[in-house]
Amino acid sequence: MMITSFRPLVTVLSWLCLCVPLAWPMAPEDVQRLDRFAEHVLQKKDLVAGYPVNQDTDLDDFYAWYTRHHLYRGVMNNVGNPRHQSPYSLNTHQFENEVVDYFAGLYGFKPGNYWGFVTASGTDGNQHGIYFGRKHLQSKSDQAPILYVSREAHYSIKKIADVQNLELRLIEANAMGQMELDDFGRQLDPNRPALIVVAMGTTFKGAVDDQAAIRQLLREKHRAPHYIHLDAALFGGYLPYADGDGWKQVNQQIQKFDSIAVSGHKFFGFDEPMGIFITTQDTFDRLNPFRVEYLNDAVPTISCSRSAINPLKFWWKIHARSRSAFRTDANAMLLGAERLLTELAAISVKAWKNPHSNTVFFEQPPADIMQRYDLAPENDRRFGRVAHFIVMPHTDKLLQPFVRDMKRWKENIRH
């Protein structure tokens, strides 16, 4: 059976270059189903505006290289500590370490004073940040730590607290989504270790928690050890490259956080979830991981088997694109968000945006607009029913059509 419209991802690029049709041992209806799915993805991807993903993946050359060498014929696995040589030699630890080194420098970690790995997602990074933080605090105190996080931070933190059986204290947020420091002060137990998750861009409103004020409050009111993890899933991607002082928010030597988690598929543009987790060497040394004899190592990650392909993609991306190209994308996103905010206000749409944010949230439009742009809904107790538009590199061409649709909606209401 011959198919021409759909190719499995791992073979499409190299075979298309050769213009060779593939024989695929599959029932015709199965092939047609796959074809329809592929067509839907490629038609819809550039219309996604309500979720923080960069659809400009730009991985054609990577997959051409990957398929040219038939790497899909072998099984690679990055199990273990990437800083130690693994008995399972089919890994990409050397590339993973170079990715970590690149981002450790980007986030201001002192040379030689960090440890990290390429994660499966931003939540995977948060899971490790909280786990490493818990072990760090247990090495300093016999008392169980309390996990503090804003109510408007990513929902995964609540789930992770449950999985790790941690006492969770949800801190109120102000109208724009930033952690309310007065409430943090009221809920802070001065005598028990504190594990604080700082939101570097809340899920819906794109708010940034005030790290300096959090540290000051800890100095004034807290006597036990503390650990600060930075959830910078989206903002940690673009802030280090953007003009202005936003980079200071994700600089470890300035902000003194203990670990950071960043997503790869959000700003950088990958075709599947991945991310990066980095912590200080002191935190890593306090982990005391379980030793696995047949791996001849102590495995520090919660996950055992890990993707070896994701580190390759990350390595490829940071070598194929210059810092100036990332800077261009970052600045364009922030300028696009400012422009969108201004244009929505000009057509009488109530809209808001936080500093350093590429997220604009606004009064919720009708269902047809929500569905057309894959907008995320929220029922906010202060603003009512709202939606948000996340300006990403691929949404530049969407801004004007979206504003026109919103204008048409407002005009229909008036008439």
Describe each region flagged by the PLM.
Residues 193, 225, 257, 271-274, ...:
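Active-site lining segments that contact anionic ligands and/or coordinate catalytic metals
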Residues 33-39, 143, 158, 289-304, ...:
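Conserved C-terminal alpha-helix-loop-beta "cap" of PLP-dependent enzymes
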Residues 79-87, 111-117, 143, 168-171, ...:
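Glycine- and acidic
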Residues 1-25:
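Classical Sec-dependent N-terminal signal peptides that target proteins to the secretory pathway
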Residues 24-112, 387:
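N-terminal entrance/gating region of PLP-dependent enzymes' catalytic architecture
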Residues 97-104, 108, 131-134, 162, ...:
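Amphipathic, well-packed alpha-helical segments that form the structural scaffold of globular domains
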Residues 241-354:
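Active-site C-terminal subdomain of aminotransferase-like
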Residues 117-288:
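Conserved PLP-enzyme active-site core in the AAT-like
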